[in-house]
């Protein structure tokens, strides 16, 4: 029924009906169309039954498992988020309490140090006052000793000056009275 014709490029095969014209494409032949629809329906029903009984339950189970896993993961993530939020709040509260304690300790320490510094300053002032009083006494006694020596030195110097200028030794009582008058003012 089929003839093979050659051409310049090689041999090709095609189907021709008797009489020299081509036969229609087999799925579109009117004579076999009804049986093809029945075969297609049977194949579709069989494929549907196989997939609905075997494949679709597995796919549905996989989807359900996946959905349950996602829900579980989301619930666990929410729980962990809530736990971390609670831990953060507790941390912030503890941090605020620690800051308050540190502030109180700092204030208490500052007050203690200020009191200690004040007490030490007063003690130092007292020691310095005692030393100052002792120094003033020492200065006064040194001044008195120096002044008594100054009177003698001034008398000796005045006597030496008068003797040098006049060539005669002056009266010591007269020199002492002149030095006393000069020292008083």
UniProtKB/Swiss-Prot annotation:
GO MF terms, alphabetically ordered: proton-transporting ATP synthase activity, rotational mechanism; proton-transporting ATPase activity, rotational mechanism
Location(s), subcellular: Cell inner membrane
A GO cellular-component term linked to this record: proton-transporting ATP synthase complex
Classification via Pfam families: ATP-synt_B (PF00430)
Residues annotated as transmembrane: 34-56
Membrane topology label: Single-pass membrane protein
CDD domains: ATP-synt_Fo_b
Region entry Disordered, spans: 1-25
Ion transport recorded as keyword: yes
Name by which UniProt lists this protein: ATP synthase subunit b 2
Naturally occurring in which organism (per UniProt): Nitrobacter winogradskyi (strain ATCC 25391 / DSM 10237 / CIP 104748 / NCIMB 11846 / Nb-255)
